[in-house]
Amino acid sequence: RWEALVDQVISDIEQQFPLQQVIGLGHSFGSLLTLMAAYKKPQLFSQVIIMDPPFVIGSKAFLFEALQKLGSKSIEKLTPAAVTVKRRDHWESIEQASQALRPNRIFKDFDEQCFADFIACGLKSDSTRNGVTLTIPKHTEAEIFRTVPAWWWRTPRKAPDIPIHVLTAKDSHFYKQ
């Protein structure tokens, strides 16, 4: 699944910016995809900026990979997957979704325009249940969390010859690792 998503990032860049390099910018899951795309096709990027990447490193990576291969349910507790599948994913209207999501700890500090952009892009019409739902189904998102590539960081490869900047908040889970 991850390789297909990396290929999608590459394809989007090649289609939208065919004659120029881009600055790769990603947060969390997007940062890891952007970095993986830069390793795969460095000529597309002038530099990469990744924020709070979900790296699984060190001894945790070995354990994480073993649990993945064994199909262990423990992965649910080590990733946001368990919370994701329990999350509400349907509202009667965009307005109801906006009112329900705004106080959430993830969104409460979002800039107004950023939150409006999330609502515009993160929700879609749900004709099956009448109303709106998440653009990316929660079960798809959970599967992505379950399959974070722990092995990727130990695979030998030449680093791209471009600047790569890693930003992380002091309070973030990734910084504390």
List each language-model region with its residue ranges:
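Helix-rich cap/lid subdomain of alpha/beta-hydrolase
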Residues: K60-T128, I144-V148
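Conserved serine/cysteine hydrolase catalytic core
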Residues: Q113-Q177
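Alpha-helical elements of Rossmann-like donor-binding domains used by nucleotide-donor carbohydrate transfer enzymes
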Residues: A4, Q8-D12, M36, Q96, ...
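Conserved hydrolase catalytic core segment
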Residues: L19-E65
